[in-house]
Amino acid sequence: MRLSTAQLIAIAYYMLSIGATVPQVDGQGETEEALIQKRSYDYYQEPCDDYPQQQQQQEPCDYPQQQQQEEPCDYPQQQPQEPCDYPQQPQEPCDYPQQPQEPCDYPQQPQEPCDNPPQPDVPCDNPPQPDVPCDNPPQPDIPCDNPPQPDIPCDNPPQPDQPDDNPPIPNIPTDWIPNIPTDWIPDIPEKPTTPATTPNIPATTTTSESSSSSSSSSSTTPKTSASTTPESSVPATTPNTSVPTTSSESTTPATSPESSVPVTSGSSILTTTSESSSAPATTPNTSVPTTTTEAKSSSTPLTTTTEHDTTVVTVTSCSNSVCTESEVTTGVIVITSKDTIYTTYCPLTETTPVSTAPATETPTGTVSTSTEQSTTVITVTSCSESSCTESEVTTGVVVVTSEETVYTTFCPLTENTPGTDSTPEASIPPMETIPAGSEPSMPAGETSPAVPKPEVPATESAPVPEMTPAGSQPSMPAGETSPAVPKSDVSATESAPAPEMTPAGTETKPAAPKSSAPATEPSPVAPGTESAPAGPGASSSPKSSVLASETSPIAPGAETAPAGSSGAITIPESSAVVSTTEGAIPTTLESVPLMQPSANYSSVAPISTFEGAGNNMRLTFGAAIIGIAAFLI
């Protein structure tokens, strides 16, 4: 006997309805019976006999009408209809593509000036009028659709020649540019004058000439030349000597920006002429020679302090209702130079060889240039047809400072003296360029002390100790420490040499000054290190307040001696670099819970507890029926 699929489904549904009538757990039978009656009240009506007819017919019927008909039907109507309204909304942005069509009207506006090209055709009889559009070559590029139009003004060959006369137009504001800085240029070299103190000292004549070129299309190149020509005359009794002539010429090329405005700056010419005559007196009839040694030194300190000005010229060009502005910046070039010549004459007689040491000359003149430089950044904005372009131009000031010192020593020897033949020696130190804000240059042979900087940037080593000549430093006990000097603005990662520790069991004694190498002074010790001087035969125990876990900057040169020291020691000159760190590194531990209790905790039992064993039994019967049906098929 084979059952059809419809019969199997009917049997399965019937068995499910029978299996669902098992008494429910936890008093949830009413809910299950209501669901069963809703599904199978046509087949099985026995449970409906126990209840009144109002409950069987009205109540169960109310649920299917509300849930199956009204509620489910409302959702498909609301939900599909509402999304149907949304496709209408994307149609609204379709109105926006119509708005970009409005900017399409703007390209028609630039086409309006394209209608004007026939207008310049009318004044073509007047050659000066088409000259204005000829200054703007990019404008004929816009009406490229009309190639014959630019050919019309091209019929007049003298027209492009006329705009060539216009370059002097931007030169109009340049009439006052050279006049501003040239008012104070002649005053600078007139200040340094050298009074004549002794007839032997040559008189120094300083002549300053300043010239300001007129405005022209080409730039003027300033030239600065300083020439010194010493002249000396020696009598016949003195061997002939020659003095070299030193001429220094420095030429500074002109810096002309790429514009139609030339840069014009004044130039100053400094000429120094020294004339000297030395006549040594000799006694020919006596056996004792007389030697006259004259040394002349001239020092002319030259200090130039100038407040530089920068001029910005704005050139505006307008054509066809479009204006273009361009800015040109002019600067000032200052050149400071100094020439110093030292000449020493050492004539010797022919009869007795005399050894004379050349005089030691120490230049006293210094050249110091203090300039407050400023850099100007100019932003040039060019606008054309609703589009602007910005470009930045940086201008500065060029300052050149040079110093030239010439040392010449003449020491001729007689013919009777054998051996050493000395030739004139001339040492010319190189040109020094002193930037703005730097220290004045020191003459050769001197060691300038290191000046401590007020602000030390990060990762900077300790300042260099001061150097003194050999044997000039007084002896100082090894255990003695100079007073501490606090540093200002030292960064956290500054590295400083560690103090020098003497070995145990030794006694500190005063250190003898060295003769071959310059001594190094002890530098100041930072606060936090104490050292006591060690007396002879007494034990000294310095205490250090620096903990093992704390590091503090220590200046170079600090020396400490442990207790119980005896015997002489040699202080080493090497120092180790220790990287220190100021301040403690904070450590914060924060505990974060892994799981946080839910704020929406509910005391209502889950739905699975209400379904109870009825659902489980129904699933069991259903599985059994499906298995039987599959077996029969």
From Swiss-Prot:
GO cellular component, one term: side of membrane
Lipidation residue positions, type GPI-anchor amidated glycine: G612
Region: Disordered, residue numbers: 40-306, 411-569
Glycosylated position list: N240, N285, N600
Propeptide feature: residues: 613-633
Membrane-related topology note: Lipid-anchor; GPI-anchor
Subcellular location as annotated: Secreted, Cell wall; Membrane
The Sequence repeat ranges on this chain: 46-58, 59-69, 70-81, 82-91, 92-101, 102-111, 112-121, 122-131, 132-141, 142-151, 152-161, 162-171, 172-179, 180-187
Additional note from the record: As a major cell surface protein expressed during infection, HWP1 detection can be used for diagnosis of invasive candidiasis. HWP1 epitopes can also be used to develop vaccines for protection against candidiasis.
Protein family according to the UniProt entry: Belongs to the HWP1 family.
Compositional bias of kind Pro residues: 115-171
Signal peptide: 1-27
Domain of life per record: Eukaryota
Native organism: Candida albicans (strain WO-1)
Gene that this sequence comes from: HWP1
One GO term of the biological process aspect: cell adhesion
Protein's name according to its UniProt entry: Hyphal wall protein 1
Compositional bias annotation for Polar residues: 414-425
Matches recorded under InterPro entries: Flocculin_t3_rpt (IPR025928)
Post-translational modification: The GPI-anchor is attached to the protein in the endoplasmic reticulum and serves to target the protein to the cell surface. There, the glucosamine-inositol phospholipid moiety is cleaved off and the GPI-modified mannoprotein is covalently attached via its lipidless GPI glycan remnant to the 1,6-beta-glucan of the outer cell wall layer. N- and O-glycosylated.
Compositionally biased region (Low complexity): 42-114, 172-183, 193-306, 507-549
Keywords annotated in UniProt: Cell adhesion, Cell wall, Glycoprotein, GPI-anchor, Lipoprotein, Membrane, Repeat, Secreted, Signal
Cited function: Major hyphal cell wall protein which plays a role of adhesin and is required for mating, normal hyphal development, cell-to-cell adhesive functions necessary for biofilm integrity, attachment to host, and virulence. Promotes interactions with host and bacterial molecules, thus leading to effective colonization within polymicrobial communities.
